[in-house]
Regions:
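Regulatory N- and C-terminal appendages and interdomain linkers associated
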Residues: 2-42, 327-347
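Short secondary-structure junctions
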Residues: 31-38, 88-91, 192-193, 283-287
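Active-site acidic catalytic loop and adjacent metal/ATP-binding pocket
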Residues: 45-57, 63-64, 95-96, 185-250
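ATP-binding pocket architecture of kinase catalytic cores
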Residues: 57-149
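ATP/Mg2+ or Mg2+-diphosphate-binding catalytic cores
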Residues: 167, 304-347
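Active-site activation/catalytic loop segments of kinase-like enzymes and analogous catalytic loops
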Residues: 249-284, 299-316
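All-alpha amphipathic helical-bundle segments outside canonical DNA-binding/catalytic cores
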Residues: 285-297
Length: 347
């Protein structure tokens, strides 16, 4: 099963559009760009934090994002990061500057950014081979980000956990609160200063990697179809708006907690091993990384659980919205506590 994210195709699924943009409004806004005439616009599936539209003009296909929470001051980091990665050959959206040379504009009272549209679609049910590709592309992202000089503290790191807990304190059940507080206390004892640090994506879930399909002739295309016997290739990585600086292995843990997650809140061992091998083909993880791995899996589960609790308790009002299961990541965190996963048993 795949969740369609193809540029310009019709979507028959739940969507999230918090700020509605009319065709007339977008046409007027695009006069600030040298992109030709507007041909088509459409709300995009799966956005939770922001409003997204596919935009097709006479000169190409793009994605328009209206930022519902972020201020203008925060956004140049993300635009410059994507520009940096794209310039180094990494497959990610390229920000489009307006006629004044600016990436960030304003539309309907919200900061807005236009980026190029990548080929492919996100997957829901994944294979070990795809997990291996995900590990490889994550390693490529970390390598491409090495020369990026701007700095941004991980926006979903420990400082955020603590502040967000205060918002949730009156909402969550006592047992949930105890688990969150206990885990935050546990994580505070592990700074991971001895691990490699750099730019992390921070949110490399299944809906943020696009796979191109392999057609019946063996060629690659991005049209819907059955590729159960062929896995396709990654067309690109999207949604960098949780990026920041942190331990690189934390990014692997966040990714593993989604790509290898089973419905029973355990990680698929075969998929996890494939992801770890894809990320580091020589399997040479340092002793510090091996020791940190089960701790980082817990940190990653906590981060996602808190985020999903927030989406459910404090939903944005939108034209088309949906929520995600927070309890799954509570159970995953408890699983990581009760049965820690160790790299040595996987590679």
């Amino acid at each position: 099963m795949r969740r369609t994210l193809l540029c310009g195709d019709t979507l028959h699924a739940l969507m999230s559009v918090y700020t509605t943009v009319t065709r007339a409004q977008l046409t007027e806004w695009l006069k600030n760009y040298s992109l030709g005439d507007l041909q088509h616009m459409q709300g995009i599936l799966s956005g939770i934090e922001n409003t997204n539209y596919f935009v097709t003009t006479s000169r190409g296909k793009y994605v328009l994002t209206l930022f519902e929470h972020m201020g203008v001051a925060e956004l140049p980091y993300y635009a410059q990061l994507m520009a940096h990665l794209a310039a180094r050959g990494f497959a990610c959206p390229t920000p489009v500057a307006n006629c004044h040379g600016q990436f960030i504009g304003e539309l309907n009272g919200k900061p807005a950014l236009l980026v190029t549209c990548l080929p492919g679609e996100s997957v829901v049910h994944v294979s070990p081979a795809q997990c291996g590709q995900v590990g490889t592309v994550l390693a490529q992202l970390h390598h491409a980000g090495q020369g990026f000089t701007q700095r941004m503290l991980n926006p979903r790191g420990p400082h955020w956990w603590k502040s967000y807990l205060q918002l949730l304190r009156s909402k969550v059940a006592p047992a949930e609160l105890r688990l969150i507080e206990s885990e935050i206390h546990f994580q505070a004892q592990h700074a991971h200063a001895d691990l490699p640090h750099g730019v992390i994506h921070g949110d490399l879930f299944r809906d943020n990697i696009l796979f191109e399909r392999v057609d019946n002739t063996g060629g690659v295309n991005d049209l819907p179809g059955n590729i159960s016997s062929k896995h396709g290739r990654i067309g690109g990585v999207i949604d960098f708006y949780f990026a920041g600086d942190d331990a690189l292995l934390l990014d692997v843990a966040v990714t593993a907690n989604d790509w290898c997650l089973r419905p029973d809140a355990t990680l698929d061992v075969e998929q996890l091993a494939a992801l770890l091998r894809g990320y580091r083909p020589d399997n040479k993880y340092s002793n510090a990384e091996k020791s940190a791995w089960p701790i980082l899996l817990r940190a990653a589960a906590l981060r996602t659980w808190l985020g999903r609790l927030g989406y459910n308790y404090f939903p944005l009002q939108g034209e088309m919205t949906f929520t995600k299961d927070a309890g799954l990541y509570q159970r995953l965190l408890q699983q990581h506590i009760d049965a820690p996963a160790h790299i040595d048993t996987l590679i």
